UniProtKB/Swiss-Prot annotation:
Compartments, as annotated in UniProt: Nucleus
Self-association state and partner proteins as the record states: Interacts with the CDK1 and the CDK2 protein kinases to form a serine/threonine kinase holoenzyme complex. The cyclin subunit imparts substrate specificity to the complex.
SMART domains hit by this protein: CYCLIN, Cyclin_C
Name listed for the protein in its UniProt record: Cyclin-A1
Transmembrane spans: none
Name of the coding gene: ccna1
Pfam family, one: Cyclin_N
Signal peptide, first to last residue: none
UniProt keyword list: Cell cycle, Cell division, Cyclin, Mitosis, Nucleus
One GO CC term, this protein: nucleus
């Protein structure tokens, strides 16, 4: 499967997404390029598959009005902070207490990478079982994660305060991050961490649409460094954007993202909670994979799922997967383990069920394609249940 980047026209016009180069670094295989629709305020983004020129993209609509700030031109990103309810044009990308003199402190962090490009991430299912299969500490770990998830959650409704990006643009970005994860065989936890970093950053900072992919790429770069045994090189992440951004820009954005997040990288995710629940629930591999599929679908929609804590979204994914395959919603042992009753989970469960029903008709299909494979028991091919036996 070929990965795709957001490749704008020469002159860095803002809001186009196209597939990455077919030639170049070893990690990506030659193949068809995918040209996506223009990132505008419209909600419709249609895929067009086919061979196209490496520099061809559709025409932009009023792209000259997008770069409204020049104060941070050396970084190549235009951000205003803090985000306020009344959207204003970005004038700088400064933190509230000080100027980010990134030019003075940026280092070439990619030159010393330990990535062995011939090796891929270790099998994550076995790794998670080894890490989490500690019954004597399971409750303590869960209690600690429940405390941390409140601290490291994005702000609900943050997208309404973004003056230049929309929910649809974020959906396209997350869909692309899924493809990047598959191309480089990244762990599922890496994807969940990257989306957490992205949402927390956007909760605090306002970003122009043409730089949204730069933030997303920096987020997955950081998540890979944190989670992977052999993270891809920085040059690989530059490449997957079709060289839309330079290595220097990516490293500067990485540093900016770290500062905004106060270097708090250990954030509980839906994936972590779900792995705990599946170990406690003793369900079959197919049910586990369906729950993973549903939890990844929840990453696409910032609303409504950002309003739910990761532990609750994980519980909803478990319930829906368990009922779809086994006819049972929420077992008593997980109620005792989590403290969540079914009544508490129902609002999130209903939203997730609605998302599952419409998944096949979405323009973004990276998650569906991922879970069609035998590795995941083909769970995205399963028909969703029409209704749930909710009180």
């Amino acid at each position: 499967m070929a990965s795709r980047g957001f490749a704008p026209l020469s002159g860095r016009q803002e809001n186009i997404m196209v597939l990455g180069r077919a030639d170049g670094l070893h990690a990506l295989k030659p193949g068809q390029r995918v040209v996506l629709g223009v990132l505008t305020e419209n909600d419709q983004h249609n895929r067009v598959f086919g061979q196209v020129s490496s520099k061809y993209v559709p025409a932009l609509r009023d792209a000259s009005t997008l770069d409204v700030s020049t104060s941070s031109a050396t970084l190549g990103v235009h951000v205003v902070e803090p985000v306020i309810a009344q959207a204003t044009k970005p004038t700088s990308f400064l933190l509230p207490s000080e100027l980010l003199l990134v030019d003075d402190v940026v280092q070439d962090l990619g030159s010393g990478s330990c990535m062995d490009s011939s090796m891929q991430s270790l099998p994550e299912e076995a790794a998670y079982e080894d890490i989490l299969c500690v019954p004597e500490y399971a409750e303590d770990i869960h209690r600690y994660l429940r405390e941390c998830e409140v601290k490291y959650r994005p702000k609900p409704g943050y997208m309404r305060k973004q003056p230049d990006i929309t929910n649809c643009m974020r959906v396209i970005l997350v869909d692309w991050l899924v493809e990047v994860g598959e191309e480089y065989k990244l762990c599922s936890e890496t994807l969940f961490l990257a989306v957490n970093y992205l949402d927390r950053f956007l909760s605090c900072m306002s970003v122009l649409r043409g730089k949204l992919q730069l933030v997303g790429t920096a987020a997955v770069l950081l998540a890979a460094k944190y989670e992977e045994v052999y993270p891809p090189e920085v040059d690989e992440f530059v490449y997957i954007t079709d060289d839309t951004y330079t290595k220097k820009q990516l490293l500067r954005m990485e540093q900016h993202l770290l500062r905004v997040l106060a270097f708090d990288m250990t954030a509980p995710t839906v994936h972590q909670f779900l792995m705990q629940y599946t170990l406690e629930g003793h369900i079959c591999a197919r049910t586990v994979n369906l729950a993973l599929y549903l939890s990844e679908l929840s990453l696409l929609e910032v609303d409504p799922f950002v309003q739910y804590l990761p532990s609750k979204t994980a519980a909803a994914a478990y319930c829906l997967a368990n009922y779809t395959l086994n006819g049972v919603l929420w077992p008593e042992n997980l109620y005792a383990f989590t403290g969540y009753s079914l009544a508490v989970i129902i609002p999130c469960l209903m939203e997730l069920h609605k998302l599952h029903l419409g998944a096949a008709g979405r323009p973004q299909q990276a998650i569906q394609e991922k879970y069609k494979g035998s590795k995941y028991c083909g769970v995205s091919l399963l028909e969703p249940v029409e209704s749930l036996p909710l009180p």
